Structures are given as structure tokens and as C-alpha cells.
């Protein structure tokens, strides 16, 4: 199992959880972004900087993902593509995104996109809380444990 992180918008507190998990569980974590990333020195953690551009990092992740890999993202279209390839997806809030629950999220995203394009202000997601961080850490641990057991 490899862990892929859509790192452009990944909060630092979530990256810290990922770094600790990579070290403790000896799992390969790869952060992908179109800007330089700071990562701790570790044989289990690497950062890949892709060229700037719309969805370049997302497309790179989708190309690399294999069935059973874990993807960390809040990007719903990226999550949908990763799920189609057999990836497991959790959001930075610890929500497990699946084939069963991704379609309604895609529909809501598209609806909000239409609202924004018509000039409606829809706001953004709430700031991450300590509870979100804990939910993420718990979900990450569960999925890594399952992934290591299955491999």
C-alpha cells in the first residue's frame, strides 16, 4: 500500500499526522503538489513537484494510483477517479469516500460550481478542528492497518 497526498491544499496539521504515520508504520507517503513542499527527512516520505497548471497534480496522482493505494484529498473529482481505479480515499477530515457516497458529493460540487459561476457566494469549507484532525488520524490508522494486513 502506498499513500498519495493531494498536497497543494492539504493542511499542515494533516501533513504532520501523515509524517508520523509514515515513520511509525513504515508506509510510503508521497505528497504531490505544483509548488515546493517541505517534508521531513525520511526514507518513507517523498515530495513530488509537478508543473503548475489546472489539475496537473491530480492527474499525476490518478496516473500513479494502483488498487489498494490510499489517497488523501478533499478534491471530489480526484477522489472519484481514484475510487474508479480501486483506490481508498479519505478527506483531511477523516471522511471515507467510497463508490457509494461519491456521486452525491460530485452532484453537490457541480451544483455549487454553477451557483458560483452565476455570481452567488457559496462560501468555503469550515476550518479544520482538533476533532477533524483526530478523525483523520483514526481513519488513516484503520486504513493503513487494513492495507498492511491485506498485502
From Swiss-Prot:
Lineage of source species: Bacteria, Pseudomonadati, Pseudomonadota, Gammaproteobacteria, Cellvibrionales
Family: Belongs to the UPF0178 family.
NCBIfam families: PRK00124.1
Protein origin, superkingdom: Bacteria
Transmembrane annotation, as ranges: none
Protein name, as recorded: UPF0178 protein Sde_3033
Organism of provenance: Saccharophagus degradans (strain 2-40 / ATCC 43961 / DSM 17024)
Pfam families listed in its UniProt record: DUF188
